[in-house]
């Protein structure tokens, strides 16, 4: 069963189940770290390798010779240079790093792609997605669940149209990725905020008041006294979430809550890589400048000799 249909079943099931009294729901989407390794170029470039390639792909480069590593890096450069002008800018490098860090997202989409691309044309239309996800309901509607399914289908169609940037109701793989994982794409952030507000706003006024905010993350049922974290969340709402202190969170206040503008690790790493590699200091990188600093970007057996010895000993 694919992720979206499983989610539909879970949504219907959850509606019938009482939550644990002290269970806390976290709706905040944080910008993840680029690597679990320490960023200390004086010791090694492991952090940079993980950031540029993703942790799993970085391991494969550690097993290549320097010549093989440079050759593969050269091929990667052409993918980073989106406008094909022969230069890699900080912006292009930031976009690449963010994409590398989202590999798990793209892998998830890849696993589902064939199931939705029914006519095998390399695209997924709204009709294809709707038929796969809601086909059973459309063929034989269940009156008891019809409202839930209809509501979710309308919501999915709205999100699909938002992800579909050219408006043809046919999604490329990138657009379909934005549809399934909207929190990962800047242009989809408004729909993430809207859906969150719809989930929490019980009185339908388009805003989130204190009780709705608390009610989304905490179920009072059977609890005589509120846990300490609930009291803290009440204080957070009054002092920080509700910025204009009108007793409710609007769209912008909700966005600041669930999509905080934390430190952008990808931008910082991009600036670092350009600074270290930009030989003529024109604030952009040529293919040659990047390949010359291959040990900073991707590594090889030579730059990861200690780990290579460990792997050899294991065999």
UniProtKB/Swiss-Prot annotation:
Ca(2+) 3 binds at residues 164, 166, 168, 175. Residues 1-19 form the signal peptide. Keywords: Calcium, Endoplasmic reticulum, Glycoprotein, Golgi apparatus, Membrane, Metal-binding, Repeat, Sarcoplasmic reticulum, Secreted, Signal. Its main location: endoplasmic reticulum. One of its GO terms (molecular function) is calcium ion binding. Ca(2+) 6 binds at residues 278, 280, 282, 284, 289. Ca(2+) 5 binds at residues 242, 244, 246, 248, 253. Interacts with ggcx. This is Calumenin.
